[in-house]
Every structure is written in structure tokens, then in C-alpha cells.
Amino acid sequence: DGVTYSPINTEFNEGSLLFDFFYKKVRFHIGCLFIRKQLLEENNLFFDEDLRLGEDLDFIYRLLITCDMYAVPYYMYKHNYRENSLMNSCRTITHYRHESFAHERIYSSVMQLYKGNRKEEIHTLLSQNRAYHKTRYLWNVLLNGDFELLNQLVESNEKELNDCNLSGKRDKRRAKILASKNYILWRMVRLVNRKKNKR
């Protein structure tokens, strides 16, 4: 049966909404958008089927880059999540991996598609999102105790961790711990975290 999802949108938005959406000045659900089928076909705008999470966000970004649009304060449809959907299941390391992959893909597709004069601004915004989700995924690999996998992931993302432009102090600290590639430190962090969770 799944879970019915019907969030509430309260405003009518129109025009070029890309940066308002980036900065969360406007918020709308994909079910509030009027989209011509012809526009989708002409611009090859479809959901990325490789994404298990974040496919709606990726689609909305690409749509906002392509055209001005209307977002109405009503939900045109409801959708049900499958019973085994990632969206209504407990958070696991799989969630974090798929989120990290989604934000990698979003960064690539948006940077490739956007041709305006604010590309550096978009790069900064999406790089922060990408770094945040990647750090969160790697941190959960650490907490899971899979240090061999973690070491491989850190090595393949070493430059990004060292050049990290994360905004939060906690996230910056985590990035430094991950980038250290210090197995003893990683084990200590995991041990402390497990003790905290047992309290």
C-alpha cells in the first residue's frame, strides 16, 4: 500500500525561480508544477533513472535552468511510496551512499546545463551540498567500522576533503578526521560514538 505523501505549498510562484529555489526563498513540491509535455520532450528533460534518491531535485534544477515556470499553491496529484521505499525506511548507510551519489550527479548535470553569468555562484552552492553529503556518507562508513572501504573512499576523495568548503564547524571537523587516514583515530571516534549511543 505504501505511504501517501501530500505536503503543503502556500504560495503561487512564477518566473525565473532557479536562484530563489537554490537559496530556499521559494519552496514547492514537484506536484505543484505545470509542465508542458512538449517542453520535456524538446529539452530531453526526464527523471534520471540511475538515481535511487534525489531524482526529483535533479529534475527540478534542470527544469528551472531550462525555462521560466509556474508553481501553484495546490497539489495536482498524490503519490504513494512503496512499502520498501528508501524514502520511508530507516536511515542506513545505503541512504547516505545514494544521497552522496545523487549530489554528485546533480552537480555534474547542473554545471553542464547552466549557461548564465552566475556559474561560479552555482558551483559554490552545489559544491557545498556535494561536500556535505559526501562527508556524511564517509562519516557513516567510519561509524559502521568498515575502515578498509573508508580508506579507499578517502583516497579517491582526498582533494575534496582537504579543500572542503563546508560551512558547519562539526562538518569541517569530521572532514579533517576522515582526511587524516589515521586508523587509530577512526577507531577511537567509533568507540566514543558507540558509548554515547548506549547511554
Which residue stretches match the model-derived regions?
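Conserved donor NDP-sugar-binding/catalytic core segment of glycosyltransferases
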Residues: D1-T4
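Conserved nucleotide-sugar donor-binding catalytic segment
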Residues: N9-Y96
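Exposed alpha-helical structural elements
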Residues: L17-L18, E121, L149
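Hydrophobic alpha-helical core bundles mediating ligand binding, dimerization, or RNAP-core interactions
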Residues: L57-I60, H103, Y107, R130-T135
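Catalytic core of nucleotide-sugar-dependent glycosyltransferases
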Residues: Y75-E83, S89-R118, R136-L161
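Short, surface-exposed acidic
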Residues: K115-L125, N165-K169
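Amphipathic alpha-helical repeat scaffolds of TPR domains
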Residues: T124-N140
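Membrane-interface aromatic/basic loop that binds lipid-linked glycans or pyrophosphate carriers
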Residues: L138-R199
